[in-house]
């Protein structure tokens, strides 16, 4: 090894530098530059694209992992591989695998390379409790976890990173083999049996058989890994897997025509993948072949920068590895947490950017998905979010079957998604946003400063999700009759402020399409253009009901009643301006009663606080003896006899009316009723 050639006897001045250091000391101070530099050629690798270089490459990489060293491939070499190049790295080692300018060609269905970190510290069985403790020099105590290891633990100082795991299933698991496990940072070491951490993971696993270990301080760098294969039926092996490593770094990896996942991060902490590039990853789930370009599995805080991927199942995805409840394979425990994917591009994928149910806190920033399609077992979403507390920031989807899909159906607990600056554009048959929650859970989506444009009948579909939106612009260019900016399904809640709904083709459109009963809609300060293509503000069917409030500024009038359809329990308060005229069309009705029969009148779905009816009585005995139920307790109904009435108007006790006595109104007189939850009562005459 290079640096060993410069070892000097103690006290020797041979090879002493100007600053007094020996060459040996200079190498040591340079860290990784002072490790062994190994060449596959020195181990017998030909790199000629003909010979099988598996054995020499494997030995070269294993030596580097065992000793701590740097492997440098030959520029222009083509290494044929017929088996896995596997290495294990212990604590404190630095390993760099630099294959820049060379290429790997797999000839069998085997992983190309796997590097696994090996913890030299022992596994400790622990118990935990929530305490208040001072973890620094401040005067304020911190709520923390006191971790007690009766048999001793291996932590020595604040800031060390550990992993805890338990035989209980991880939160929001989607497989019965996904067991709990989360990393933590040591805040204080009190003794050889007690330490503290501010991580709250332990609250989830109290009372279980909890174990901890110190994560190995191994450094692994992989540079320029370039793998090219051919699609082969039955092949499914992964290409590169890094497991149980602290801050591994993968620099400019590249693949083409491979048969399974490319880069797998399994149980790593703070991994970085920089500028990965991939084309044509085969996706055949029936054969166990999954075209995952970057698979972030049970890792913590990964940074994936500059993905450029074409034709894969996922350009990025999370997953949880399979393990046994009582084994100590800590790197296979837990779910993916707090990873960030930045400046990514996925084109022609099945779902470009994806998270599975157990993931938490995954953030996509400035990522673009173009032309995602429905593939095998996938839904064609540019962004498919199935975890909790994920976020999309300044992301774009173009011509994807679904721009962004939030699916909480398989999540066992509550979940949230945050969307800011999202842009979508797609043709007919493609949906901008699909938000699907699970009945009985709280699933929330917060959207801000976003815009989508579609030729599809509906721009956004919501089911069992609470949506809060601000400054969202929905452009519906659909020529299909009765399209809508928002389609509200079962168990959905929509609250918007600001933004716009724009229509430019077709007819009979509406801002809201109510597709189920029980939904709640609160739309405020909405700009609406293309009102000439509209029929209603709210459209629904006669069997559906819900609570709806719409406040909008239209660029022109819409015909007739702003509510189309609706059951008797539908409650709608609509306020809008059109042509500089302010209107509350459901709050006022001009009616005529021209018969002496008992007349039951409907509120016309109005959910306004105050409703006014002006009734013209034209025959003797004209009367009202029934009114549909009020929308809420305290709702007020003013009934006036029009000055144009030629006869008295009689308000009788009857269906939902309990005034104590009938009220007779002369022309120009009125009565005020209020809803007490059971009947309309007289407030004044």
From Swiss-Prot:
Name by which UniProt lists this protein = Depolymerase 2, capsule K5-specific
What domain of life is recorded for the organism? Viruses
Q: Which family does it belong to?
A: In the N-terminal section; belongs to the Przondovirus depolymerase 2 family.
Species of origin: Klebsiella phage K5-2 (Bacteriophage K5-2)
Which InterPro entries does the record associate with it?
Answer: Pectin_lyas_fold (IPR012334)
Can you name a GO cellular component term? Answer: virus tail
Function of the molecule? Functions as a receptor binding protein (RBP) and probably mediates the attachment to the host capsular exopolysaccharides. Displays a depolymerase activity that specifically degrades the K5-type polysaccharides of Klebsiella pneumoniae capsule, which allows the phage to reach the host cell membrane and bind the entry receptor.
Q: Which Gene3D superfamilies does the UniProt record give?
A: Single-stranded right-handed beta-helix, Pectin lyase-like
């Amino acid at each position: 090894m290079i640096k060993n050639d410069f070892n000097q006897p103690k006290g020797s001045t041979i090879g002493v530098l100007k600053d007094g250091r020996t060459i040996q000391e200079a190498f040591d101070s340079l860290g990784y530059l002072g490790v062994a530099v190994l060449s596959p050629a020195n181990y017998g690798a030909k790199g000629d694209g003909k010979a099988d270089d598996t054995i020499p490459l494997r030995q070269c990489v294993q030596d580097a992992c065992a000793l701590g060293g740097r492997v440098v491939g030959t520029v222009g070499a083509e290494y044929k591989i017929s088996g896995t190049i596997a290495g294990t790295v212990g604590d404190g080692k630095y390993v760099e695998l630099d294959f820049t300018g060379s290429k790997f060609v797999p000839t069998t269905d085997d992983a190309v390379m796997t590097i696994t970190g090996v913890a030299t510290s022992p596994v400790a069985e622990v118990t935990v409790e929530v305490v208040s403790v001072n973890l620094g020099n401040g005067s304020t105590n911190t709520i923390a976890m006191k971790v007690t290891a009766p048999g001793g633990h291996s932590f020595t100082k604040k800031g060390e990173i550990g992993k805890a795991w338990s035989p209980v299933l991880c939160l929001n698991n989607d497989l019965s083999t996904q067991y709990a496990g989360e990393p933590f940072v040591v805040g204080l070491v009190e003794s050889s049996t007690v330490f503290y951490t501010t991580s709250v993971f332990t609250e989830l696993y109290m009372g279980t058989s909890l174990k901890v270990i110190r994560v190995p301080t191994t450094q692994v760098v992989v540079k320029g890994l370039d793998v090219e294969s051919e699609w082969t039926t039955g092949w499914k092996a992964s290409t590169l897997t890094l497991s149980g490593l602290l801050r591994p770094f993968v620099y400019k990896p590249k693949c083409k025509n491979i048969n399974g996942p490319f880069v797998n991060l399994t149980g790593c902490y703070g991994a970085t993948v920089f500028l990965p590039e991939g084309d044509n990853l085969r996706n055949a789930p029936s054969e166990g072949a999954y075209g995952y370009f970057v698979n972030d599995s049970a890792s913590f805080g990964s940074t994936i920068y500059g993905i450029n991927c074409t034709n894969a199942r996922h350009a990025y995805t999370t997953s949880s590895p399979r393990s046994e409840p009582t084994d100590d394979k800590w790197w296979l425990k837990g779910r993916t947490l707090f990873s960030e994917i930045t400046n990514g591009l996925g084109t022609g994928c099945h779902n470009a950017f994806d998270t599975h149910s157990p993931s938490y806190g995954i953030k996509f920033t400035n990522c673009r998905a173009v032309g995602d399609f429905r593939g095998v077992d996938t839904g064609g979403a540019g962004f498919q979010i199935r975890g909790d507390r994920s976020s999309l920031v300044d992301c774009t989807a173009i011509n994807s079957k679904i721009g962004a899909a939030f699916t909480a159906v398989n999540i066992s607990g509550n979940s949230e998604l945050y969307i800011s600056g999202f842009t979508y554009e797609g043709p007919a048959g493609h949906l901008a946003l699909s938000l699907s929650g699970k009945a009985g859970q709280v699933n929330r989506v917060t959207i801000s400063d976003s815009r989508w444009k579609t030729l599809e009948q509906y721009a956004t579909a919501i089911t069992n999700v609470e949506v809060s939106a601000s400054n969202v612009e929905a452009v519906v260019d659909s020529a299909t009759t009765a399209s809508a900016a928002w389609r509200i399904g079962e168990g959905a809640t929509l609250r918007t402020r600001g933004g716009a709904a724009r229509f430019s083709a077709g007819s009979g459109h509406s801002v809201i399409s109510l597709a189920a009963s029980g939904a709640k809609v609160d739309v405020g300060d909405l700009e609406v253009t293309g009102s000439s293509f509209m029929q209603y503000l709210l459209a629904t069917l006669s069997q559906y009901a819900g609570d709806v409030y719409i406040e909008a500024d239209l660029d022109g009038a819409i015909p007739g009643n702003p509510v189309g359809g609706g059951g008797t329990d539908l409650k709608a308060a609509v306020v809008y301006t059109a042509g500089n005229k302010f209107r509350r069309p459901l709050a006022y009705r001009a009616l005529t009663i021209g018969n002496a029969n008992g007349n039951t009148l409907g509120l016309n779905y109005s959910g306004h606080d105050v409703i006014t009816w002006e009734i013209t009585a034209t025959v003797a005995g004209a009367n009202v003896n029934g009114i549909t139920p009020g929308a809420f307790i305290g709702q007020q109904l003013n009934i006036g006899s029009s000055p144009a009435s030629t006869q008295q108007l009689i308000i009788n006790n009857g269906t939902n009316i309990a005034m104590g006595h009938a009220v007779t109104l002369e022309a120009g007189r009125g009565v005020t009723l209020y809803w007490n939850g059971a009947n309309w009562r007289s407030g004044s005459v």
